[in-house]
């Protein structure tokens, strides 16, 4: 992955968006998540939280503690340096799922549309590790990457 162009965009008076290009890629998102961890470890006074998205990181800060320019100056070295292995390592979660027809009403539709049996769809869903790009919009709603490289499911 080539180094993306980084832009610092004001998001109101208390947030800064660190935007990495225009494409959505798993490797890029992993870098963004790692940057959020690096910022937390740096404990920059005035920074209250970071929120990763597909291709950017929102940094919330207190402008009474540090200015936008001061924040960019503190972030730039973190953006420019490769993430620590600990920061880049993804968290792993095992999530229980239920494919009961009452709780998964679209299972039959997905099976029919993909030409797979319901059992094959379930197996396909469970045989992959899902990468969560971000949580958001609906609280706690995971946004996961493309699951399949074929037209199945």
Please annotate each region the language model reported.
Residues 1-81:
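Generic N-terminal segment detector
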Residues 52-53, 91, 105:
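Short glycine-enriched loop/turn motifs at secondary-structure junctions
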Residues 46, 82, 128-132:
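Short secondary-structure junctions and interdomain/linker hinges
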Residues 83-89:
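Conserved short beta-strand edge segments in small beta-sheet-based binding/regulatory domains
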Residues 14-16, 55, 93-95, 128-130, ...:
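Structural beta-strand/beta-sheet cores of well-ordered domains, especially the beta-sheet scaffolds
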Residues 89-99:
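Internal glycine-rich flexible loops
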Residues 97-147:
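Anionic-ligand-binding alpha/beta catalytic cores of soluble enzymes and soluble regulatory domains
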Residues 148-153:
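Conserved small/polar residues in nucleotide/adenosyl-binding loops
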């Amino acid at each position: 992955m080539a180094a993306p162009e980084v832009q610092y965009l004001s998001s109101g008076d208390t947030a800064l968006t660190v935007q990495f290009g225009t494409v959505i890629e798993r490797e890029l998102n992993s870098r963004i998540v790692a940057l959020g961890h690096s910022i937390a470890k740096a404990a920059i006074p005035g920074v209250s939280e970071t929120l990763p998205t597909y291709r950017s990181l929102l940094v919330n800060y207190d402008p009474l503690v540090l200015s936008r320019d001061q924040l960019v100056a503190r972030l730039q070295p973190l953006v420019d340096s490769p993430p620590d292995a600990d920061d880049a390592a993804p968290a792993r979660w095992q999530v229980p799922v239920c494919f009961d027809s009452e709780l998964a009403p679209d299972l039959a539709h997905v099976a029919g549309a993909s030409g797979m049996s319901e059992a094959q769809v379930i197996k396909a869903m469970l045989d992959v590790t899902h990468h969560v790009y971000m949580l958001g919009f609906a609280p706690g709603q995971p946004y996961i990457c493309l699951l399949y490289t074929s037209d199945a499911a």
